[in-house]
């Protein structure tokens, strides 16, 4: 009987040990990242007599930069409580000032232009947009937004919400650049910018390139039907260390390139139309140019 008790105790200990071992072998749960709280870039009261609502442009950093930006629209009441919007629009503008004839500018508006941006779209309870700011705020011009929205069937407007666009601090994205395509004497300006990855690594990276046609000062549709060949070379060299074909998908021209190590690289682009015919970028003087983005990480 005593022997049986010893066997039973040993068996229970083995089961307990095995159970603990099984629990220890289970992978630890992957922590779910907490979304970053939005930070206000700029805010102002609505234009109605009562100044009923405060309108805020927000993102995760609290700063707009020259280049591609995600943004959110928030509207709060006098108590600071966010209100539900039934509809909303966002249009960015830049006032360009007249020159003073001495290399500077005077605070008199010469003309106003917009920039590439997407219509506000509701995701859950958040209204979101993306904008490509092609210039930074400076002596030559300032940015502002016109915003409309509807609450409980009533429409409100904010004709001018001033905000600042700062220089792009992320060298991994390079800068916004432009080129022209000529048909006769009239040139059609285009903008292009690398929008991803924001944090490249040594090895393979998926890149995303945006190209926009400047139809006029208000309209900047994306070019979606080209093919872009990209060649990656190290600074000071023209030898290709990686090449890829970028095709339009998920909002941008995408493909994968390889960086052998952290450093400074030039991404040179060759453009082709839908029929495979070369598209030759030119400058304002109709001279053929090469287009590229220089990055560093």
Where do the PLM segments sit?
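Short amphipathic beta-strand segments in non-cytosolic proteins
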Residues: 91-115, 226-244
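Aromatic sugar-binding surface patches on proteins
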Residues: 119-132, 247-255
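Surface-exposed beta-loop interaction hotspot
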Residues: 136-205
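C-terminal motif of bacterial Sec signal peptides marking the signal peptidase cleavage site
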Residues: 16-19
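Beta-strand-rich structural segments
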Residues: 65-81, 190-193, 201-217
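Acidic/polar, low-complexity intrinsically disordered N-terminal segments immediately downstream
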Residues: 23-104
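Residue-level recognition of secondary-structure-to-loop junctions
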Residues: 121, 133-137, 149, 247, ...
């Amino acid at each position: 009987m005593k022997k049986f008790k010893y066997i039973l105790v040993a068996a229970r200990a083995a089961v307990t040990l095995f159970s603990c071992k099984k629990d220890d072998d289970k992978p630890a749960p992957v922590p779910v990242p907490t979304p970053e709280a939005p930070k206000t870039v700029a805010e102002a009261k609505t234009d109605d007599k009562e100044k009923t609502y405060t309108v805020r442009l927000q993102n995760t950093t609290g700063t707009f930069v020259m280049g591609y930006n995600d943004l959110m629209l928030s509207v709060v009441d006098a108590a600071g409580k966010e209100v539900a919007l039934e509809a909303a629009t966002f249009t960015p503008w830049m006032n360009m000032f007249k020159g003073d004839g001495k290399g500077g500018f005077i605070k008199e508006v010469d003309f106003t232009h917009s920039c590439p941006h997407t219509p506000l779209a509701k995701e859950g309870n958040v209204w979101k947009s993306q904008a490509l700011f092609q210039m930074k705020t400076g002596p030559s011009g300032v940015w502002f937004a016109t915003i409309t929205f509807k609450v409980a069937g009533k429409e409100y407007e904010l004709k001018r919400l001033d905000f600042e666009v700062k220089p792009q601090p992320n060298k991994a994205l390079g800068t916004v650049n432009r080129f022209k395509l000529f048909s006769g004497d009239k040139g059609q300006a285009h903008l292009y910018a690398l929008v991803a990855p924001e944090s490249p690594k040594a090895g393979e990276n998926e890149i995303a390139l945006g190209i926009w046609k400047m139809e006029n000062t208000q309209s900047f549709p994306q070019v979606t039907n080209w093919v872009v060949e990209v060649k990656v070379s190290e600074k000071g060299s023209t030898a290709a260390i990686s090449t890829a074909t970028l095709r339009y998908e998920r909002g941008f021209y995408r493909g994968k390139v390889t960086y052998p190590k952290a450093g400074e690289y030039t991404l040179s682009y060759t453009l082709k139309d839908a029929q495979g015919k070369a598209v030759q970028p030119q400058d304002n003087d109709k001279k053929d140019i090469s287009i590229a983005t220089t990055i560093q990480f």
